[in-house]
Amino acid sequence: MTNQYGILFKQEQAHDDAIWSVAWGTNKKENSETVVTGSLDDLVKVWKWRDERLDLQWSLEGHQLGVVSVDISHTLPIAASSSLDAHIRLWDLENGKQIKSIDAGPVDAWTLAFSPDSQYLATGTHVGKVNIFGVESGKKEYSLDTRGKFILSIAYSPDGKYLASGAIDGIINIFDIATGKLLHTLEGHAMPIRSLTFSPDSQLLVTASDDGYIKIYDVQHANLAGTLSGHASWVLNVAFCPDDTHFVSSSSDKSVKVWDVGTRTCVHTFFDHQDQVWGVKYNGNGSKIVSVGDDQEIHIYDCPI
């Protein structure tokens, strides 16, 4: 166990173009950890994290255009990717094979997320709709309509009750999944919402915007609980730590920041990337952070827990 922050590993030239998305999954059966990256080079890559290094396991071909979003199932060894080619692909992480390709339609599936039970995949669209696909069926099961603009970001609450979406005009919508009803519309940002993340206890929603601010909302009451500044430019990604007390953010200012939820302060900043940092995630126990960016690198950091 480490008691300080530091960079642990750097994978240079991980892709041939900018890396825009990353996911970190734990295979409890094998006690192994998997990192999945999606890049504008049209590839999805699957890496094994072991002995404090990343080893490339699969390079997954199939997308015709850049990969903008990846996620890993919470229950099965499956990854999902969405691309500018308007297709969602499901991949078997045990053999590197494509399970299915879903045509998401002409209004690109920009961002995607597995539901907590991994039975569904939610994707945000250009026309303000969240489309929900069945993982098993590969078909669109239903849609949630924000009546808003292009959706850049979506997140499920870990308890499975809520789905939040963030749009290009800065509007955030929170839906009740059981009823499909729109519960709250939050107007805290005036610029695109690049990312949002629920706390592990599903009580808080953290949002990241091009306005350079991070906002924390109380989900139940839709109250603004905090506004955090510190990044010098667009905030591109946020991810909660499993311990419920910290979250991480990344920015086009080339930095990765770790924040304390209770004190609303930045407790550490990593300046290891050479360009915009598009994706950050914690591992399963919160002891590591992965980040990816336009510099085509994957960085793994140590976190005190």
Curated annotation (Swiss-Prot):
In which compartments does the protein localize?
Answer: Nucleus; Cytoplasm
GO cellular-component term (any): nucleus
Report any Pfam family annotated for this entry: WD40
Q: Does the keyword Transcription apply?
A: yes
Coiled coil segments of this chain = none
Q: How does it assemble?
A: Component of the PAF1 complex, which consists of CDC73, PAF1, LEO1, CTR9, RTF1 and SKIC8. The PAF1 complex interacts with PHF5A. Within the PAF1 complex interacts directly with PHF5A. Component of the SKI complex which consists of SKIC2, SKIC3 and SKIC8.
Could you identify this protein by its name?
Superkiller complex protein 8
Q: Which organism is it from?
A: Homo sapiens (Human)
